[in-house]
Every structure is written in C-alpha cells, then in structure tokens.
Swiss-Prot record:
Domain comment as written in the entry: Has the structural arrangement of an alpha-helix connected to antiparallel beta-sheets by disulfide bonds (CS-alpha/beta).
Taxonomic lineage of the native organism: Eukaryota, Metazoa, Ecdysozoa, Arthropoda, Chelicerata
InterPro entries documented for this protein: Scorpion_toxin-like_sf, Scorpion_toxinS_K_inh
Cystine connections: 30-50, 36-55, 40-57
Molecular-function GO terms, alphabetical: ion channel inhibitor activity; potassium channel regulator activity; toxin activity
Name of the protein described by the UniProt record: Potassium channel toxin alpha-KTx 3.16
Length: 60
C-alpha cells in the first residue's frame, strides 16, 4: 500500500510539472483569473489564470 501511495504521488507531481510547462504567459495584465478567460481563448488556449499579475494560459 505504501508503494502504491508513493507511485500515485510521483505521478501527480509529474503531471503538474508537465501541465505547467505546457502553459504560456501572454502580455495581458490581470487582477483575477476571470479576466484571463477571453484573452486566453483568443490566443488559442482553453484555460487561463492570473499569476503574478499576468495571464497564464494552458491548453488543457
């Protein structure tokens, strides 16, 4: 059971790293994630969130 939990955690961390690397930052300033939805869709990405005052878009 401990091995299964360790493998599950490793897979979760790897998927987070892959998801972050696929994203791209666009030059749109924001204060909350709701402001990023339309600019990210216009950039050809599906989702967006506000990180450090700029929109970060991801394809998933």
């Amino acid at each position: 059971m401990k091995v299964f939990s360790a493998v599950l955690i490793i897979l979760f961390v790897c998927s987070m790293i892959i998801g972050i690397s696929e994203g791209k930052e666009i030059p749109v300033k924001c204060k909350h994630s709701g402001q990023c939805l339309q600019p990210c869709k216009d950039a050809g990405m599906r989702f967006g969130k506000c990180m450090n005052g700029k929109c970060n878009c991801t394809p998933k």
